From Swiss-Prot:
Binds 2 heme b groups non-covalently. The cytochrome bc1 complex contains 3 respiratory subunits (MT-CYB, CYC1 and UQCRFS1), 2 core proteins (UQCRC1 and UQCRC2) and probably 6 low-molecular weight proteins. The keyword Protein transport does not apply. Belongs to the cytochrome b family. The gene is mt-cyb. One of its GO terms (molecular function) is metal ion binding. Its main location: mitochondrion. Heme b b566 binds at residue 51. One of its GO terms (biological process) is mitochondrial electron transport, ubiquinol to cytochrome c. This is Cytochrome b. Keywords: Electron transport, Heme, Iron, Membrane, Metal-binding, Mitochondrion, Mitochondrion inner membrane, Respiratory chain, Transmembrane, Transmembrane helix, Transport, Ubiquinone. Component of the ubiquinol-cytochrome c reductase complex (complex III or cytochrome b-c1 complex) that is part of the mitochondrial respiratory chain. The b-c1 complex mediates electron transfer from ubiquinol to cytochrome c. Contributes to the generation of a proton gradient across the mitochondrial membrane that is then used for ATP synthesis. The lineage of its organism: Eukaryota, Metazoa, Chordata, Craniata, Vertebrata.
Amino acid sequence: TALFLAMHYTSDIATAFSSVAHICRDVNYGWLIRNMHANGASFFFICIYLHIGRGLYYGSYLYKETWNVGVVLLLLTMM
């Protein structure tokens, strides 16, 4: 869904809102693709947070190198 949305989205500050409106109104099933993308991204981050919670529960934070790699991956995912 991200590639399809990127084909129609403009990141310019003057036209960003109108490009989102264009996706929702003029693109066939654009509203559905936008909602699927938003819900999929939210579910992805919920899974990441559950994985972090599992690591906290089982004490994986004691493995400093592994935990630091995970933190870096989380920050890269959020960029």
